[in-house]
Amino acid sequence: RDISMFGALPNCTIIEPCNAIETEQALRWCVEKAKQNCMIRLAISPSPRTIALPADYHFTFGQGSVINDGKDAILFAYGPVMMNEALIAAERLKEQGISLKVVNLPWLNDVDLSWLKDVCAESNDIFTLDNHSGYGGVGDLLLNALMSSPTLSSRRLVKFAVDEIPACGTPEEALSYHGLDGQSLAERILASMS
């Protein structure tokens, strides 16, 4: 719920990097380029896998990067844990013949509309994955952006988020409980596309 709370503050940018390289770039951006207050969210446990950014990746305001290319649907995620689950979902869906584009969007309350149009150009099915409440997270950010764009407003967006009081347990148990683990996400995406 911190994204919605801090996102409501004027001139406050919220970032959650997916790996050490992006964390370093985010910190450098906040110190050297930002004209506003910045909040960097960091995972408190080791990353479940190394999230590889494209070789030409540059940390650019409101933009992210395609981590897994796909043509049937798009899943936006952020941070090492949720990016891992998004990539697991892409792997499971590939077994079902579904090609899922996974996009890392570290900017949790800002998006570059021109970049978003390019990323979403070939897909009508857009999904978002938040480690946060469904209110005020990346799902709402992208929903607002899609609705404000004549070329994107016909896209269908489905938000996956923590829809109740967060469960206690190991990360795997909590993700599974909320249906945010990779296998559950794959099943939910497949059901939504049917």
Predicted regions and their residues:
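Conserved thiamine diphosphate
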Residues: 1-33
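Midchain, well-structured core segments that form catalytic/ion-binding scaffolds
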Residues: 20, 40, 45
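Short, surface-exposed loop/strand segments
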Residues: 37
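Thiamine diphosphate
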Residues: 43-194
